[in-house]
């Protein structure tokens, strides 16, 4: 999974016709090349534009409102112990920015965030309510990924033990599902890969149909599949678009199958 919340945070979903404030576009091939317009998130189907991560959405909550909210939550015996030792270690003055708003629910980024995401232990934090009546919904570490429509999941890309065929327009890579999928062979469930090519990088975006909810978390070795490029990889870096920002594709410690 992309994020394990402590406790469980409610996923923030919406339809394309009625987006909550701060949410960008769901990932589609047409915007794979423009990170300023896609939505990124830490899990679930909701997200926000990368452009709001450094300073947050303007004009939503004031410093006084948030400090008062943090003070109230830290005074609540239901939350005090966990919040004081984790999310709000710095107390009411913990740095924050608003990432997303869904009605009376606010998703905040705590700690240091930049346009590339959280840094140095920064977290996401969700609270709901209004001045004088706040409740904590959850939060956790954030491993950013572009947000997908419901029913799809990212697969992780790795290089094979023999390395990449840099002279081919169809270099082989390994794919691994990131959700619990009962150890299934992911290949029948893969979508069409999207490759964004520049003079220095090739970024692969590859998804699969999400497994059933009752899937077990039995793992399996990466499966051998081929990317389709417009020109040979050459000396360009191969990046995995299942993260934000995309990360360098590296060799798996487990031999690929298939």
What residues fall within each predicted segment?
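Extracytoplasmic low-complexity, Pro/Thr/Ser/Ala/Gly-rich segments
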Residues: 15-106, 110, 143-196, 243-258
């Amino acid at each position: 999974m992309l994020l394990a919340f402590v406790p469980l945070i409610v996923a923030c979903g919406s339809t394309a016709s009625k987006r909550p404030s701060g949410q960008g576009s769901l990932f589609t091939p047409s915007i794979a090349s423009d990170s300023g317009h896609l939505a990124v998130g830490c899990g679930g189907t909701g997200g926000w534009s990368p452009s709001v991560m450094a300073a947050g959405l303007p004009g939503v909550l004031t410093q006084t409102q948030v400090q008062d909210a943090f003070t109230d939550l830290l005074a609540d015996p239901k939350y005090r112990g966990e919040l004081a030792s984790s999310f709000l270690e710095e107390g009411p003055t913990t740095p924050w920015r608003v990432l997303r708003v869904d009605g009376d629910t606010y998703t905040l980024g705590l700690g240091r965030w930049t346009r590339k995401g959280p840094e140095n232990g920064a977290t996401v934090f969700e609270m709901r309510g209004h001045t004088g009546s706040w409740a904590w919904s959850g939060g956790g570490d954030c491993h950013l990924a572009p947000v997908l429509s419901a029913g799809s999941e990212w697969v992780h890309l790795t290089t094979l033990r023999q390395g990449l065929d840099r002279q081919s327009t169809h270099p082989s890579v390994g794919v691994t599902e990131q959700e619990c999928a009962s150890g299934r062979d992911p290949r029948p469930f893969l979508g069409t890969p999207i490759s964004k090519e520049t003079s220095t990088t090739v970024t692969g975006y590859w998804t699969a149909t999400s497994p059933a909810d009752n899937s077990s978390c039995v793992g399996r070795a990466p499966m051998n599949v081929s990317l389709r490029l417009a020109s040979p990889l050459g000396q360009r870096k191969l990046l995995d678009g299942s993260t934000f920002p995309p990360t360098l594709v590296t060799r798996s410690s487990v031999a690929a199958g298939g």
